[in-house]
């Protein structure tokens, strides 16, 4: 049976020295989107604060890098942050489960802003967005048509549509993928069980058996399948028949026309990997219409270093915090 969203009950509250967190929900269409709302130290509900929506990578959840690293540390710097689970994933509702549909993912951002503007302590004129990996691509795409976002940042932002089209890097990879998806949809329409595949190998042993050595794949397995980053809301499952829209989608389409907000792009200067966030960072920088845009290269950092490693994420935040302070204020 498909897993449903957690019931929208009184939020649980967790307090740390420098921020407070509440688990909340907001609506996307007919289902609940689960989110963690973080408040800065000495939060005063009679005042108004800038807010930042934090989006997780493909296959991830709010308890990983988007919330536990960037959401927490931005809250400690005086911002309200909202890290959410994508629709159909993690603790959020929506069907079919484990879908990766760009239109649905982008709509989550608009619904997140709809939620924030109902909170009396959020200044609706000072809302920004930050996305990590595929969440960065979705954040950029959302910001093009969601003018309530006043500042945009990506950390190793990746264009998921490009990744899907490139596939195994053979000329007909995208067409072969679409043919396979079409066949699977036909089978499911006739009663077959949904095909749940995986994003990455399920263990280091499976990685070695497959003979995969690309730095992004190796470090993804280390992050997602070990205590380093493993979370129940990130089960490494993907509904294969949901992928056709992603193959025909481009996260940066029309950025040269519609992406005008101040933009800060963070990429790693270490070994480039298969997910392509290094080149996507340059592509986005060159295409964005934003008159204020910066490209930060963290020396020696790989894609996954910028998920959770203290030194690289610290260097990213050294520029992200003043960027958001300049454009949103604290």
Model-found features: residue ranges?
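Alpha/beta-hydrolase-fold enzymes
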Residues: 140-223
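Conserved alpha/beta-hydrolase
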Residues: 73-91
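Short beta-strand/loop motif that positions the catalytic acidic residue
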Residues: 265-267
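The serine-hydrolase catalytic nucleophile loop
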Residues: 59-72, 86
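Conserved alpha/beta-hydrolase "acid-adjacent" motif
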Residues: 272-281
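Alpha/beta-hydrolase active-site loop
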Residues: 99-120
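N-terminal cap/lid segment of alpha/beta-hydrolase-fold proteins
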Residues: 18-47
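Catalytic histidine-centered segment of alpha/beta-hydrolase-like enzymes
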Residues: 301-313
């Amino acid at each position: 049976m498909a897993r449903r969203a957690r019931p929208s009950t009184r939020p649980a509250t967790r307090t740390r020295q420098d921020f407070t967190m509440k688990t909340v929900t907001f609506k996307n269409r007919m289902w609940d989107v689960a989110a963690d709302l973080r408040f800065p130290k000495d939060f005063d509900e009679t005042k108004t604060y800038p807010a930042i929506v934090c989006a997780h990578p493909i296959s991830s959840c709010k308890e990983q890098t988007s919330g536990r690293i960037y959401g927490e540390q931005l809250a400690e710097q005086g911002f309200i942050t909202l890290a959410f689970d994508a629709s159909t994933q993690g603790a959020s509702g929506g069907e079919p489960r484990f879908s990766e549909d760009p239109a649905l993912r982008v709509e989550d951002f608009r619904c997140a802003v709809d939620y924030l503007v109902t909170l009396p302590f959020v200044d609706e004129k000072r809302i920004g967005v930050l996305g990590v990996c595929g969440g960065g691509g979705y954040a950029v795409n959302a910001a093009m048509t969601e003018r309530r976002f006043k500042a945009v940042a990506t950390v190793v932002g990746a264009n998921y549509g490009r990744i899907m089209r490139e596939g195994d890097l053979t000329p007909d990879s995208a067409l072969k993928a679409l043919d396979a998806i079409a066949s699977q949809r036909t089978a499911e329409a006739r009663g077959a069980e949904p095909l749940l595949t995986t994003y990455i190998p399920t263990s280091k042993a499976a990685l070695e058996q497959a003979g995969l050595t690309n730095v992004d794949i190796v470090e993804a397995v280390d992050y997602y399948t070990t205590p380093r980053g493993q979370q129940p809301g990130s089960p490494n499952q993907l509904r294969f028949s949901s992928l056709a829209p992603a193959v025909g989608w481009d996260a940066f389409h029309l950025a040269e026309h519609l992406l005008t907000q101040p933009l800060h792009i963070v990429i790693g200067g270490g070994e480039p990997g298969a997910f392509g966030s290094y080149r996507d960072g340059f592509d986005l920088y060159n295409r964005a219409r934003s008159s204020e845009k910066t490209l930060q290269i963290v020396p020696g950092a790989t894609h996954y270093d910028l998920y959770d490693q203290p030194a690289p994420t610290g260097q990213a935040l050294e520029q992200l915090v003043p960027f958001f302070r300049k454009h949103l204020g604290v």
